[in-house]
């Protein structure tokens, strides 16, 4: 075969291969957000946990440059009405969240106004394989504690207002808001789920605790969720990272102000009013992150250092005041200058 013939064959093969590659790349790159979320299941069920992917229909309602208000009402509003009527409707705006008209109005605007952010954060969620992480977190808490959370209903949503991120009012009215920029999506999935799982298990054990409605209970509850997350990752994250992704500077701020933090907080430990005094103190002191999370973690860490590496499991059974008293933390604070 002549050299020109060989060259032509090589050129054609290269051209065809290049076209095939471009076609494959194009099909991947041009897969729209609508095509991606269409393959997302409406819900995921693991044991007594159900995840409702409400964001799926908040996006699909905008497919084909139109807006399907019936889809929003049927697949988003009526699917989990409690989060809209009793959570967002109470905390933010009743007409906006607790009525069909209000829900349709803001859902009609949200995709147009926040399209880039929605695409980015939804893609991040899909890439981090949320369902696998959920299964791993559940297996982890079963192994570590011998307990499993009950009656959990978590809705993944796109909300037009920030302020909740990952949380809720009761086990069956929890949300993960993909659009809350105060939270990193991967962190919410990988570290937020273990944290919340411990809340779901710990809170039912407070039923007979005489101080279940006090700031001390909230402090121990949040600190314990952070401590469980630290144990769950078995040394792969630091203590500071387990407490709301604190930096070393954040942590050191608390160490430098530790006596002041405790002395300002402790008079409110058994307060039973409607306010949230410890969060207010955190703002007043310009404390980094959330003051009561760090303080609760610190108390539990002292308890574990005193009673042994597996003693953190005692916290599920002890009244919160007993955790504080037995931890030795009060004595430590008294000795600080």
Annotated model-derived regions:
Residues 101-244:
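Acidic/His-rich structured neighborhood in mature extracellular/periplasmic domains
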Residues 20-22:
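Bacterial signal peptide processing site
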Residues 6-10:
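Sec-dependent N-terminal signal peptides
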Residues 85, 257-337:
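Pan-zinc metallopeptidase signature
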Residues 24-131:
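Non-catalytic architectural context of zinc metalloproteases
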Residues 1-5:
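Positively charged n-region of N-terminal signal peptides that target proteins for export
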Residues 27-62, 213-259, 330:
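Post-HExxH zinc-binding segment in Zn-dependent metallohydrolases
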Residues 15-18:
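C-terminal motif of bacterial Sec signal peptides marking the signal peptidase cleavage site
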């Amino acid at each position: 075969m002549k050299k020109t013939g060989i060259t032509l064959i090589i050129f054609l093969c290269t051209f065809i291969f290049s076209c095939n590659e471009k076609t494959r790349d194009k099909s991947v790159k041009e897969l729209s957000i609508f095509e991606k979320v269409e393959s997302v299941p409406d819900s995921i069920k693991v044991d007594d946990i159900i995840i409702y992917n409400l964001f799926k229909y908040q996006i699909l309602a905008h497919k084909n440059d139109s807006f399907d208000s019936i889809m929003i009402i049927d697949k988003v509003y009526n699917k989990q009405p409690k989060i809209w009527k009793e959570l967002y409707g109470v905390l933010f705006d009743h007409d906006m969240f607790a009525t069909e008209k209000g829900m349709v109005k803001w859902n009609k605007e949200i995709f147009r106004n926040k399209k880039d952010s929605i695409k980015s954060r939804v893609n991040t969620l899909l890439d981090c394989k949320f369902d696998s992480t959920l299964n791993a977190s559940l297996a982890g808490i079963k192994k570590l504690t011998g307990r499993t959370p009950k009656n959990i209903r978590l809705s993944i949503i796109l909300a037009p207002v920030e302020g909740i991120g990952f949380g809720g009012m009761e086990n069956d009215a929890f949300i993960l808001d993909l659009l809350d920029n105060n939270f990193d999506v991967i962190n919410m999935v990988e570290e937020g789920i273990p944290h919340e799982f411990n809340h779901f298990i710990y809170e039912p054990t407070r039923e007979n605790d005489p101080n279940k409605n006090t700031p001390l209970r909230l402090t121990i509850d949040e600190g314990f969720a952070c401590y469980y997350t630290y144990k769950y990752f078995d040394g792969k994250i630091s203590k500071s990272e387990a407490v709301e992704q604190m930096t070393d500077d954040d942590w050191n701020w608390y160490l430098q102000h530790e006596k002041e933090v405790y002395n300002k907080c402790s008079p409110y430990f058994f307060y039973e009013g409607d306010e949230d005094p410890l969060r207010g103190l955190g703002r007043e002191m310009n404390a980094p992150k959330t003051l009561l999370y760090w303080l609760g973690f610190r108390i539990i860490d002292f308890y574990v250092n005193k009673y042994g590496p597996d003693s953190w499991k005692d916290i599920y059974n002890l009244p919160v005041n007993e955790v504080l008293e037995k931890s030795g933390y009060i004595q430590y604070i008294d000795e600080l200058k």
